Design a protein with these regions (language model features):
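Short, small/polar residue-rich loop motifs at catalytic or cofactor-binding pockets
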Residues: 65, 88, 169-171
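Thiol-/selenol-based redox modules, centered on thioredoxin-like
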Residues: 171-209
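Short acidic-hydrophobic, aromatic-tinged amphipathic segments that line or gate anion-handling sites
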Residues: 72, 146-150
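Short active-site neighborhood of thiol/selenol oxidoreductases, capturing the structured segment around
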Residues: 79-109, 121
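Structural microenvironment flanking redox-active thiols in thiol-disulfide oxidoreductases
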Residues: 103-142, 147, 155-156
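Short, basic/aromatic recognition patches
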Residues: 158-164
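N-terminal targeting signals for export/organelle localization
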Residues: 2-9, 13-68, 72
Length: 209
C-alpha cells in the first residue's frame, strides 16, 4: 500500500498540473504560484491537494546565511553552496529535470532573465544524477545555468529543509542569495506541480546588483 501511495505521489509531483488554483496565475498552461510555503521539518507542501511533509535538520530563511551544503557538479566535483562567491545567485530548486514543470522552470531561468545572467549566477539544483543534468543542459542548449546535484550526500535538501520526506526529492523552490551569501528571497512552492514566481525572484536579484 505504501509503495502504491508513493508511486501516485511521484506521478503527481513530477507531472504538469492539470488544475489551476485560484491564487495562481497561469503561464503557458502551467500555474505560477504567488504564495510560499515554509521550509523545514514540521511543514508541508502539497501534490495535487495531498499534503506531504518536508524534512531536514535546518531551514533556509531570509536574512540568514545560506546553509553550508555540498552538492555535485556535472564534472562530478563537490561544490559548497554555502560558500561565499562574491556574486548574487538565483538558485532554482526542482524535483526532477525530466518533467514538464521542471523543464519550464529551468528554461525560464535561462531564457527569460532579462540579461541578469551577465552578472548573476544562475543555478539549478535537483536530485537528478549529474550525468542526467549534463544531458538535459546539452539537449536544451542551456549554457548559462550551473547544474548541481544533491543526489549523493543530500546535504542541500537537509540543510535547507527542502526534502519531501516520502519521496526523498527536493521541493520546488527559488532562492536569491546576495554577494555575502545572505538569503534575500525564498519561495517554496506550496503545490509542487505549480511553477515558482521566477520573475519576482529575478526582480529581487536585480535590486541587489
Amino acid at each position: 500500500m505504501t509503495r502504491t501511495i508513493l508511486a501516485l505521489f511521484t506521478a503527481a509531483a513530477l507531472g504538469a498540473c492539470a488544475s489551476k488554483p485560484a491564487t495562481n496565475e497561469v503561464q503557458a498552461d502551467l500555474p505560477v504560484a504567488k504564495e510560499s510555503a515554509r521550509a523545514g521539518a514540521g511543514n508541508n507542501v502539497s501534490m495535487r491537494g495531498n499534503p506531504v511533509p518536508l524534512g531536514g535538520s535546518g531551514v533556509v530563511e531570509v536574512g540568514k546565511p545560506l546553509p553550508a551544503a555540498k552538492v555535485i557538479g556535472t564534472d562530478l566535483k563537490p561544490v559548497d553552496l554555502g560558500a561565499t562567491t562574491g556574486k548574487v545567485r538565483i538558485i532554482s530548486v526542482v524535483p526532477s529535470l525530466d518533467t514538464p514543470t521542471c523543464d519550464k522552470q529551468t528554461h525560464e531561468l535561462s531564457e527569460k532573465n532579462g540579461g541578469l545572467d551577465s552578472s548573476v549566477e544562475m543555478i539549478t539544483v535537483s536530485r537528478d544524477l549529474p550525468f542526467a543534468q549534463k544531458r538535459f543542459a546539452r539537449e536544451a542548449k542551456i549554457g548559462n545555468v550551473t547544474f548541481l546535484s544533491d543526489y549523493n550526500m543530500r546535504e542541500f535538501g537537509d540543510a535547507n529543509g527542502l526534502t519531501i520526506e516520502p519521496l526523498a526529492l527536493l521541493a520546488r523552490a527559488v532562492i536569491v542569495v546576495d554577494k555575502d551569501n545572505i538569503v534575500r528571497y525564498v519561495q517554496v512552492v506550496p503545490e509542487v506541480t505549480a511553477l515558482p514566481d521566477m520573475q519576482a525572484a529575478m526582480q529581487v536579484a536585480r535590486g541587489l546588483l
